[in-house]
Amino acid sequence: MSTEAPARGLKSAAIALHALDKATDRCRECPLGERATQSVFGEGPVHARLMVVGEQPGDKEDLEGRPFVGPAGRLFDRAVAELGWSRERLYVTNAVKHFKYELRGKRRIHKTPAQREAAACLHWLESEIALVQPAALIALGGVAARSLLGRPVAVMSERGQWHQDAAGRQVLVTLHPSALLRGDPQQKEAAWKAWLADLSLASPAYEAVAGRQRESAAPPAGRAKRAARREPA
């Protein structure tokens, strides 16, 4: 069977993702884009089997233009390593594409996006999903879970469970890694093990990556972003 058609499809998806990436940088459908340095789009194989969706970029992500590179991202990378996964085989993104924060002195402190802000970003996320076509998704935290499932999600009672989105895709709900950073230090080890147990439920979907060779036929989505900070409004 010829590989030309799948290769063309991958190239088209990569081009479309790149265009979406550029478009999110210009997005002003909510006020967050006015204050952020830049948008932070997803990155990973164009047709990754498993997509991981977080809440929003943090301070470091906002400056570097890449998802999950701050403290929560390092914790996520540690979990990926312990599970025997490779981040290069995951498509990682956020439900909200711009950093929401409040200034405290010279520090920019994370603020949870309002539902209207997440809703304004939903079409970007839906477009990513349509192009990447993951078999399964992991929702890290309540904002991501609500965006994917279209309803409020009680993360603590629904974590470690598979749910179906409107298109019938499987969505695993668990905590955002930042919740582990804020948690009770005495419970940190137990919380870590419980989080790993949640994530491990997605291992069958991850392991199926090896049989989906077409993901390696195109370069990963994502781009090198500028590092200059936009002055806060």
Go through the PLM ranges and name each one.
Residues S2-A233:
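A polyanion-binding, active-site-adjacent surface
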